[in-house]
């Protein structure tokens, strides 16, 4: 059934933060199989409103919760996709193509199939199975998982262990389980000099040489050497803007943006202090003024492998005959919200084609993921 569910889910044009009926489809399916469900819409303005779902079967402990998102990233060029339609699932050569196939409608489809089969085959099992789904993960992630978790806890629900279905595997299904994530901090730097004619540089103060020096040092600095589970922290320049359309004018100001993905040796605040010390030094040397702004929507985190995390890893190894590694690589995810409530693993399909043209998953990989999810429910419940 996971192929059927995935094809249906791909058919919803749920470009973040839109839901396009995907949540309602899952809600209806789970209701038909005895789940208690509730859809909540959060967001003050219509343009910000996000659709969320919590569904649970049973009320006993432990509550195993699948956390995921139905929203997908936008598609730029439909013509380059199979059948010219990223929102119409295409089955070719043992693969399912479509936007969201791996990130992360495929994992949702697998856990839907695994949980419904488990309930059918194991009447009277101990514990509970639940879903927490949102349409706001690929975007601002403001009114999705974060708010929904708080809401269900206010209603008296408690999650004992969560599986976040992000595409975590690298080369084959089962090779990677994520137990943490790097943090992310964005910087915007404005430097003000003095405009003038390029023929009279002594009557101006060009802010660009200062910016070049700053960015050169920032991009060459070694922030750390990494840790056991984290790669080294990394800074990337994402934008430089002068706003100068002519070649004979020294600009009055310049702006640069950069991002740091950091491990648990840092915080956004300590990095901002380190960055500003470098900026301040060069701006003083070049006699220019600056303004530095930074914002962080995600700090780094790492979990000590709990009993259930280790149990999940054993199920992966037993099911797929591959020993998974614990990792924290990649971008941010909603796991950063879930970890405040319960232990978790992030485990899903291969990440190779996520967000790409002709995103796809192998049907054989869907079967492997289904098997892991089903066998974990058997083991724990």
UniProtKB/Swiss-Prot annotation:
Zn(2+) 2 binds at residues 103, 138, 355. Keywords: Amino-acid biosynthesis, Cobalt, Diaminopimelate biosynthesis, Hydrolase, Lysine biosynthesis, Metal-binding, Zinc. Pathway: Amino-acid biosynthesis; L-lysine biosynthesis via DAP pathway; LL-2,6-diaminopimelate from (S)-tetrahydrodipicolinate (succinylase route): step 3/3. Pfam families: M20_dimer, Peptidase_M20. GO terms for molecular function: acetylornithine deacetylase activity; cobalt ion binding; succinyl-diaminopimelate desuccinylase activity; zinc ion binding. Its EC number is 3.5.1.18. Zn(2+) 1 binds at residues 69, 103, 166. GO terms for biological process: diaminopimelate biosynthetic process; L-arginine biosynthetic process; lysine biosynthetic process via diaminopimelate. Binds 2 Zn(2+) or Co(2+) ions per subunit. Its cofactor is Zn(2+); Co(2+). InterPro entries: ArgE/DapE_CS, Bact_exopeptidase_dim_dom, DapE_proteobac, Peptidase_M20, Peptidase_M20_dimer, Peptidase_M20A. Catalyzes the hydrolysis of N-succinyl-L,L-diaminopimelic acid (SDAP), forming succinate and LL-2,6-diaminopimelate (DAP), an intermediate involved in the bacterial biosynthesis of lysine and meso-diaminopimelic acid, an essential component of bacterial cell walls. Homodimer. Belongs to the peptidase M20A family. DapE subfamily. This is Succinyl-diaminopimelate desuccinylase. It comes from Rickettsia akari (strain Hartford). The gene is dapE.
């Amino acid at each position: 059934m996971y192929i059927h569910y995935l094809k249906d889910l791909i058919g919803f044009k749920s470009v973040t933060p839109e839901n396009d009926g995907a949540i309602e489809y899952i809600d209806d399916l789970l209701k038909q199989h005895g789940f208690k469900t509730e859809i909540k819409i959060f967001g003050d303005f219509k343009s910000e409103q996000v659709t969320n779902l919590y569904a649970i079967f049973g009320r006993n402990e432990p509550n195993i919760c699948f956390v995921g998102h139905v929203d997908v990233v936008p598609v730029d060029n439909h013509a380059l996709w199979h059948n010219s339609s990223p929102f119409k699932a295409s089955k070719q050569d043992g693969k399912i193509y479509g936007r969201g196939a791996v990130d992360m409608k495929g994992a949702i489809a697998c856990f839907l199939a695994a949980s419904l089969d488990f309930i059918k085959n194991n009447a009277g099992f101990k514990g509970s199975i639940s879903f927490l789904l949102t349409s706001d993960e690929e975007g601002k992630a403001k009114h999705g998982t974060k708010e929904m978790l708080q809401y269900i806890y206010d209603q008296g629900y408690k999650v004992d262990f969560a599986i976040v279905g992000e595409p975590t595997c690298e080369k084959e299904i089962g090779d990677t389980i994520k137990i943490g994530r790097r943090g992310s901090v964005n910087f915007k730097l404005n430097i003000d000099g003095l405009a003038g004619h390029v023929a009279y540089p002594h009557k101006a103060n060009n802010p660009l040489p200062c910016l070049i020096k700053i960015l050169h040092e920032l991009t060459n600095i070694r922030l750390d050497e990494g840790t056991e589970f984290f790669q080294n922290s990394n800074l990337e320049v994402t934008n430089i803007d002068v706003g100068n359309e002519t070649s004979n004018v020294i600009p009055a100001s310049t702006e640069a943006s950069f991002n740091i993905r950091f491990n648990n040796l840092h915080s956004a605040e300590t990095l901002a202090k380190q960055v500003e010390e470098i900026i301040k030094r060069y701006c003083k040397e070049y006699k220019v003024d600056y303004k530095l702004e930074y914002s962080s929507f995600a700090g780094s985190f790492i979990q000590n492998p709990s009993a259930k995390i280790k149990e999940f890893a054993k199920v992966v190894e037993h099911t797929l005959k591959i020993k998974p590694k614990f990792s924290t690589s990649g971008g941010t995810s909603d796991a950063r919200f879930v970890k405040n409530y319960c232990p978790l693993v992030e485990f899903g399909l291969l990440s190779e084609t996520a967000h790409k043209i002709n995103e796809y998953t192998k049907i054989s990989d869907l079967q492997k993921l289904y098997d892991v999810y089903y066998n974990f429910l058997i083991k724990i419940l």
